[in-house]
Structure formats: structure tokens, C-alpha cells
């Protein structure tokens, strides 16, 4: 089983805030002690942090749920509960975090030690010391802690490389990477020897270096899933220069020009501006007897197919096996990197409109009303459900406060207008009460 994993679906659940306390100060010589219930502590958030030592999402294969700790409950004498420590989850550099339901990109973690809160911990509930008023100096009211955020996330890893090697299987990409860098990829005389991206550091002269990535071989239909498909096409997205490796020998019986067109069609079909990147054609295996003749045929076909305003692409003749022609290729690659800015990983359509429009909008109604199969009424909605969860039903004053808040929301009026009658059951989550007209 491969130890390389570049996608993972996980659940993150931030910690619940601590419950506020209902307490009263009872001490000698303090006749008017009053309320003394402290607030609950904040729940622990779940935070992703870039770890340069990680190179795969393998840690998420079996560990798929990450829970933050709850905050401590409030205490007597006005003492607040301790906030929970945040849960730090380490991820590889180059991890993109998406909302699994909407597909929206939440963050692209590419900087060293970069952190991002993926699930925020819940606020601590207020103790009864917060609810004291001149009319009610000793309230028996406190809040439960706010639930922490709960999300399903999709993680996608894209390797951080400056240069990407693309081409059909067995054209010599891994061999080329092994002789120009410190990488030691698996090399074999069969297709798909490379099944995971290999990365190597290439030194060009003094102090000049770049990262090169050898991608698993592409085949026709890769953009729609053929072969290893888009599983590894995503890793090309962060590169700034592409080296298109072509096999000029007759060993595989392939037509270099058809291979060239097919691979470029796949890159274009993937639709991530890959064809906008500078691309150098690398005519590999030029040590073979028939290579020069096949290269001449390739150049003829390429020239005949160019548009009138198109320039002939740069072609470098190399042999990864006997290490010829490599210095010129690496020097030109380094020049292109110096001239080419980074490409945005996501286009405007993927990230949405960047222009913000401000204006008045109708406030979202705090609740919705529906009917259950047995004829009962069900209240739902983020605001009213959050209010319900944070209400401490162990104290009558808290229950009365909840009833007042529901009336302020317009729940009674809405139920009445929809035909609710005395004695009808009204439900919020698993709680049930009777409607009183």
C-alpha cells in the first residue's frame, strides 16, 4: 500500500463553552451577598498548522475526527471557568482546506508555520452574576455554553514545486529527475513505475536552486480520470514552469508529436491555466540511434501545425541515461523561473466575486416552522436552536426567559397564524412542549 495520500475527508468539532453557574454568595458579615455564579470558559478551537516535516496526508487515513476540549464550568464566588486549550492539528505545507458540503476553499496553507482556525470553540455561558438587575437582584438564570463549530472538511495536498515534469509513462521523467537533483525515485522498465509525485532540489550554479517534481505518467483521458487521472494532475497546479518530456527512441513505438499534442490537450482540459505556464520541450533518449531522425520528423510536424503568429517552442536535446544536454536545459529553466510570477491556484470563478457590495438586506428569520408526521409542530433554525441549547432548563427563571425570547422572535404569533391550537405539541430538536393559546 502506498504511504502517499493527497486527499482526506475529516470532521472537526470544536469544544463546547463551559456552562455558566447559578450561585449566591453566603458569607459571614456579607448580608447582601447577591448572585455569585461565574461564566463558563471558552471551548477549545481546532487549528491547522503547517508542518514542513510532513509530506503526505497519511496521518488522516485512520484519524478522521478531531475534537476540541470543552471549557470549564463557571464556579461560585464569581470565579470563571478556565478556557480550554486549542487543539493544534499539523498538516503538510501545500494543503488546501475546503468545505465538504459547498466546495468553498477556506484556506490554502502554503507558508511556513501558517495557522488557521478551522473550527471555532464555543463561547462560555454567562453566570447569574451577569443577569442581576435592580428589578431582579438575585436571578436564578444562567446560560449553557455555546456549542463549538462542527464541520466536515476536504483536505487536498498539492506539492510545492517550481518545475513540473510531464509526459507519458516511461518517457524518462524519473531518470531525468534522479540525475539533475537529489531525488531517488523508483525507476523501472515498465509503465507507471512512478505512482506518487517525486520531488528533488536542483542546484544550478552557486546559490541558485529550484524544486522539481516528477509527476506520474499521464495518458489520454487523464483529466476525466483515466490512468492515475486527476489524482495527480492537481500537483502540477503550483508549478511555474513545465518540462514536457518526449521519448525520441523507438522502444515504445510511440509517435512523439501525437504524444505532445495529447498531453497538452489533457493539461488544457484540466482547465487550470496550465497551458499559460512556460513549457520547454525536452527531447529525451537522444543517445538512441534513431532519435535524431525522429526529432527531425517531430520538428517538421510541429512547425507545420503552428499558427502564423506562433513561435517555434524551445526544444532541448538530452539523454538522462548518459547525462548529456542537461546543463543548457537547467540554465534555461532557471531563467524562466526568474521571469515567471506565481500563478493563482484558484480562478475568480472558484473563489467567487472579489467585489463586495454593501446594502440593506432582509434579516434572516430566526426560525422556521414545519409539521411532523403526527401533526406536531417543529421549530428549526440556527438562531432558535442555539438559543435552546444555551438555555439551562434546570431553573424556572431560565425557562421563563426562553419563553419570553421565543415570543419576541414571533414564535407564538406564527404558530397561531398557521393554525396551532391549545394542546398541540411543539418541538425543538428533542425537546417537546404544549402550545398554549
From Swiss-Prot:
Top-level taxon of origin = Bacteria
Gene designation? obg
What top-tier enzyme class does this entry carry? Answer: hydrolase
Q: Which GO terms describe its molecular function?
A: GTP binding; GTPase activity; magnesium ion binding
The record's note on quaternary structure and interaction partners says: Monomer.
Which Gene3D superfamilies does UniProt cross-reference here?
GTP-binding protein OBG, C-terminal domain (3.30.300.350), GTP1/OBG domain (2.70.210.12), P-loop containing nucleotide triphosphate hydrolases (3.40.50.300)
Q: Which residues bind Mg(2+)?
A: 174, 194
Determine if Cytoplasm is one of this entry's keywords.
yes
- Indicate the family of this protein: Belongs to the TRAFAC class OBG-HflX-like GTPase superfamily. OBG GTPase family.
Q: Which UniProt keywords apply?
A: Cytoplasm, GTP-binding, Hydrolase, Magnesium, Metal-binding, Nucleotide-binding
Required co-factor(s) are: Mg(2+)
Carries keyword Heme? no
Q: What is the protein's name according to its record?
A: GTPase Obg
Q: Which InterPro entries match?
A: G_OBG, GTP-bd, GTP-bd_Obg/CgtA, GTP-bd_prot_GTP1/OBG_C_sf, GTP1-OBG_CS, GTP1_OBG_dom, GTP1_OBG_dom_sf, OBG_GTPase
| Positions that bind GTP | 167-174, 192-196, 214-217, 284-287, 319-321
The Obg domain covers which part of the protein? 2-160
Subcellular localization: Cytoplasm
PANTHER family in the record: DEVELOPMENTALLY REGULATED GTP-BINDING PROTEIN-RELATED, MITOCHONDRIAL RIBOSOME-ASSOCIATED GTPASE 2
Q: What is its EC number?
A: 3.6.5.-
Which Pfam families does the record match to this protein? DUF1967, GTP1_OBG, MMR_HSR1
The free-text function statement in the UniProt record for this protein reads: An essential GTPase which binds GTP, GDP and possibly (p)ppGpp with moderate affinity, with high nucleotide exchange rates and a fairly low GTP hydrolysis rate. Plays a role in control of the cell cycle, stress response, ribosome biogenesis and in those bacteria that undergo differentiation, in morphogenesis control.
**What GO cellular component entries does it have?**
cytoplasm
- Report the residue ranges that make up the OBG-type G domain in this protein: 161-338
* Domain OCT: residue ranges: 359-437
- Offer one example of a GO biological process linked to this entry: ribosome biogenesis
